[in-house]
C-alpha cells in the first residue's frame, strides 16, 4: 500500500504539469486574432482586409404596463445587452460568439453552457457550395420572426418566445446557387435536464429520451431579384421514449426598399408540453396536483408590414393570431382547444443619423388578448388582456 501511495505522490507533479500545458505556445509562431487583423509596418500599423467585427448591442426602454386598461407599473428596463464577436480567420474557417448579459450564467447539464451564451461555433467553409457549422447555434426554424436579429424586434409572438432556439450541435449548409440554400441540422432539443425543461417534471411513467436531439431540414429561396424570400423548415426530435416533437414552420417575406412585409406560419406538435403554455394554466384549483401536459399542439400566424417612408423614419404594424390545444386526451387534460390569443403592435422608429444605422429611437405599442375555452376555465385559469407602451433606444456599437 505504501508503494502505491509513494508512486501516486511521485506522479502528481507530472500530472500538474500536464494540466498546465499550453495548447498553443509562443514558440509556435501562430498569429493571434489581433495579429490577423492588424499588421505592423514602417511608420505604424494597418488593418488587414479580413472580415472580423466586435459589436456591443444595447436595447433599453421606459415601459408603462396596463392590465385591462388599468396602469400596473411604470419603469425602466434593459431588455438586451449583448456582446458579439464574429469573423473569418482564413478562407476556410470562421467563428461566431455572442453572449447575452440578460440571461442565467449557470451552465446547463446537457451542453455545459449557460443560456447567456447564444452563439459559440466554428464554421468550416469546405467549398463555395458547402459549409459545416459546429457548436452552439441557432435552431434552423423557418419564418422571418424566428430568424431576424432580436434587436430589430420589440416583441416576439408567444410561439417564438417559448422555444429555446439556441442549441449545441452540427449543421451542414448546401448552397445550390446564390438564391437556393438547404440546411441540414442536428442539435440538442434542450440545454439541460427534463426538470429544467418542464416546470412540473417529466410525466410519470415516461422514460427519459436516449437520443434527445432535434433534426431539421430548412430550405431558403430567393426570387424576383432577391425581393421575395421563402424560409421553410421541418423538424423532428425525441422528448421521451415514445414521445416526439414536430415543427413545421415557414416564412414568406417581401423585402424591397422602402417596404418589408412577411407572413409566418409556425406549428408544433409535442408529445410532452415543451412550451409549457398549457401546463402553466393549472395549479389554481383547489386540490389539484399540477402535472406536465402531454400531446399539445401550437399554431401561430404572424403578419408584419414595414414602411421606411423617410431615410430617418420607419413605421410598422404587426399582428399575431395563436391557438393552443390538446390533440389527444391525457390525465386531467381533455382533447380540444385551450387558448386563443392575439397581439397587435404599432411602432414608429427614428434613426437620428442616416450614416449610423445601428442607432434608433422608437415608440412602441403592444396589445395582447387572450380567450380561454371551457377546457382551461375548468382549471380555474385566467389570462387578462394586457397593454404596454414603450419609449426606447437601440444602439449597436461597432467596436471593431
Label the model's feature ranges:
Residues 112-115, 191-198, 334, 338-341:
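Short, electropositive alpha-helical surface patch
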Residues 1-22:
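Bacterial Sec-dependent N-terminal signal peptides
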Residues 145-147, 196-197, 275:
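Short aromatic-enriched loop/helix-cap "lid" or pocket-rim segments at secondary-structure transitions
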Residues 18-59, 392-395:
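N-terminal periplasmic/intermembrane-space "pro-region" immediately following the signal or transit peptide
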Residues 21-28, 61-71, 109-110, 224-400:
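Outer-membrane beta-barrel pore domains
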Residues 45-64, 70-192, 221-224, 370:
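Outer membrane beta-barrel
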Residues 79, 116, 128, 166, ...:
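Exposed loop/turn and edge beta-strand positions of beta-sandwich/beta-sheet ligand-binding modules
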Residues 185, 189-247:
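Loop-centered beta-sheet repeat module
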Amino acid at each position: 500500500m505504501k508503494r502505491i501511495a509513494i508512486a501516486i505522490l511521485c506522479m502528481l507533479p507530472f500530472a500538474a504539469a500536464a494540466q498546465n500545458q499550453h495548447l498553443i505556445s509562443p514558440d509556435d509562431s501562430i498569429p493571434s486574432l489581433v495579429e490577423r487583423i492588424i499588421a505592423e509596418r514602417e511608420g505604424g500599423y494597418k488593418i488587414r482586409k479580413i472580415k472580423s467585427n466586435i459589436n456591443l448591442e444595447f436595447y433599453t426602454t421606459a415601459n408603462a404596463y396596463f392590465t385591462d386598461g388599468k396602469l400596473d407599473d411604470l419603469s425602466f428596463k434593459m431588455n438586451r445587452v449583448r456582446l458579439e464577436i464574429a469573423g473569418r480567420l482564413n478562407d476556410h474557417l470562421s467563428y461566431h460568439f455572442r453572449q447575452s448579459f440578460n440571461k442565467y450564467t449557470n451552465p446547463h447539464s446537457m451542453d455545459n453552457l449557460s443560456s447567456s451564451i447564444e452563439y459559440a461555433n466554428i464554421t468550416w467553409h469546405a467549398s463555395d457550395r458547402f459549409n459545416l457549422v459546429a457548436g452552439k447555434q441557432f435552431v434552423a426554424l423557418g419564418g422571418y420572426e424566428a430568424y431576424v436579429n432580436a434587436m430589430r424586434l420589440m416583441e416576439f409572438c408567444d410561439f417564438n418566445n417559448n422555444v429555446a432556439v439556441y442549441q449545441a450541435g452540427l449543421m451542414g449548409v448546401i448552397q445550390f446557387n446564390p438564391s437556393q440554400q438547404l440546411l441540414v441540422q442536428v442539435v440538442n432539443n434542450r440545454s439541460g435536464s427534463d426538470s429544467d425543461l418542464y416546470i412540473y417534471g417529466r410525466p410519470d411513467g415516461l422514460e427519459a429520451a436516449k437520443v434527445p436531439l432535434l433534426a431539421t431540414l430548412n430550405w431558403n429561396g430567393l426570387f424576383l431579384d432577391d425581393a421575395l424570400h421563402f424560409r421553410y423548415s421541418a423538424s423532428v426530435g425525441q422528448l421521451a421514449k415514445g414521445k416526439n416533437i414536430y415543427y413545421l414552420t415557414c416564412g414568406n417575406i417581401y423585402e424591397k426598399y422602402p417596404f418589408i412585409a412577411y407572413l409566418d406560419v409556425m406549428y408544433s406538435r409535442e408529445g410532452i408540453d415543451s412550451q409549457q403554455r398549457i401546463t402553466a394554466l393549472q395549479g389554481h384549483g383547489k386540490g389539484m396536483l399540477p402535472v406536465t401536459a402531454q400531446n399539445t399542439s401550437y399554431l401561430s400566424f404572424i403578419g408584419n408590414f414595414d414602411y421606411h417612408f423617410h431615410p430617418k423614419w420607419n413605421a410598422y404594424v404587426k399582428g399575431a393570431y395563436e391557438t393552443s390545444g390538446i390533440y389527444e386526451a391525457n390525465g386531467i387534460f381533455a382533447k380540444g382547444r385551450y387558448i386563443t390569443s392575439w397581439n397587435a403592435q404599432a411602432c414608429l422608429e427614428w434613426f437620428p443619423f442616416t450614416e449610423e444605422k445601428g442607432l434608433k429611437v422608437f415608440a412602441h405599442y403592444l396589445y395582447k388578448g387572450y380567450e380561454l375555452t371551457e377546457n382551461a376555465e375548468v382549471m380555474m385559469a385566467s389570462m387578462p388582456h394586457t397593454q404596454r407602451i414603450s419609449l426606447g433606444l437601440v444602439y449597436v456599437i461597432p467596436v471593431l
